[in-house]
């Protein structure tokens, strides 16, 4: 929990805002990269998790590449100083102009998610007079044991190309003159906490890579995605995810020869270093006796609870009361679903108190909106307090 001294310093900032723990971010990256380098694994940061400029500069210093899901994310990464040859670009709906931009920038690979997309990349590459590196994003039909809203690897998902369609299109893909298949990409989902899922993924990848190789594709890398979850329930108990356990599973079960193994981590890098600081506006009690705390933050700053039903630990960082009550924490947006959590046990909470909504460094600011014409939240960094 934030100390009273830190809470007092935060009082001068206009709420709501994101507070980023720079020391924890550095510790997380040091932990990740020390283990990744041990295995010679390549790491890409999933920039969709958080594109804050200050965080990107820190991440870049650790030699991490970038995983993008839009042309503007590619642009953001390049403008932040990342080497284009460390950038991979996935996404099921790449626009022509986005593909053209990626081709112009000579990024490492465009991860293609349909046969029609491969055809378009080939056409646009021909226009540019280039041969463009692509990776085949394969839908592996794996249940990642996570929230269905962030499951990307089952058979009916919009993501990736079915293995059967790739097999039926081999001759066509190999006939294209302006694309070169250099990688295989897979991503089964996000917030995965059951690590045996990664073993199942490895077994499926091994078969796919062997068959693609036998069909004549000379793969330089295998990108196994990311998806490692974080502890939203008790973030203080696990501020840094268990990268070592995931890498140990991959090392034991993934059999892809001398090919480079790439990962795409987003949530696991930045989730725990960020929290949303919001101020209590009002208290009221409904006709049914439910105690509401209305804060100046809302689903426009942090949409995950409203969108996914996601849980975030909430604390009152200014109240010193001994009495604790159960509250429902709601935001200012004109939506009934704008609820951060229900039955939250907090010390007696009054107007002006500061609450922190923890583990909000990933998919918080990057999913923020200006619905109801709300201002976008600011950012405060721990080393500047």
What annotation goes with each model-predicted range?
Residues 44, 133, 221, 260, ...:
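Hydrophobic "anchor" residues on beta-strands that sit immediately upstream
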């Amino acid at each position: 929990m934030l100390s009273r001294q830190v809470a007092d310093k935060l009082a001068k900032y206009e709420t709501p805002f994101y507070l980023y723990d720079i020391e924890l971010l550095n510790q997380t990256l040091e932990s990740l990269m020390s283990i990744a380098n041990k295995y010679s694994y390549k790491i890409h940061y999933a920039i969709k998790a958080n594109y804050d400029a200050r965080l990107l500069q820190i991440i870049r210093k650790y030699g991490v590449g970038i995983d993008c899901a839009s042309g503007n994310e590619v642009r953001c990464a390049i403008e932040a100083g990342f080497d284009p040859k460390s950038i991979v670009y996935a996404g099921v709906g790449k626009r022509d102009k986005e593909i053209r931009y990626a081709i112009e920038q000579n990024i490492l690979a465009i991860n293609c998610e349909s046969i029609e997309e491969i055809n378009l990349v080939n056409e646009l590459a021909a226009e540019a007079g280039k041969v463009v590196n692509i990776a085949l994003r394969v839908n592996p039909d794996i249940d990642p044991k996570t929230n269905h809203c962030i499951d990307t690897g089952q058979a009916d998902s919009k993501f990736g190309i079915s293995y059967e369609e790739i097999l039926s299109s081999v001759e066509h893909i190999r006939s294209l003159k302006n694309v070169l298949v250099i990688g295989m990409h897979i991503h089964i989902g996000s917030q995965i906490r059951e690590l045996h899922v990664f073993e199942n993924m490895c077994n499926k990848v091994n078969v796919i890579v062997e068959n693609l190789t036998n069909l004549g594709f000379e793969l330089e890398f295998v990108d196994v995605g990311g998806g490692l979850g974080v502890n939203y329930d008790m973030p203080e108990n696990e501020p840094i995810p268990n990268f070592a356990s995931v890498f140990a599973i991959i090392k034991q079960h993934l059999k892809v020869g001398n090919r480079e193994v790439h990962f795409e981590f987003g949530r696991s890098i930045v989730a725990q270093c960020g929290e949303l600081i919001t101020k209590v506006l009002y208290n009221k009690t409904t006709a049914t006796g439910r105690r509401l705390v209305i804060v100046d933050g809302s689903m426009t700053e942090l949409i995950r609870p409203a969108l996914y039903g996601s849980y975030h630990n909430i604390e009152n960082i200014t109240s010193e009361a001994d009495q604790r009550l159960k509250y429902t924490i709601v935001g200012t947006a004109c939506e009934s679903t704008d609820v951060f959590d229900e039955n939250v046990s907090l010390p007696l909470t009054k107007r002006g108190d500061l609450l922190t909504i923890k583990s909000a460094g990933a998919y918080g600011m990057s999913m923020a909106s200006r619905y109801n014409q709300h201002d976008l939240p600011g950012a405060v960094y721990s080393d500047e307090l």
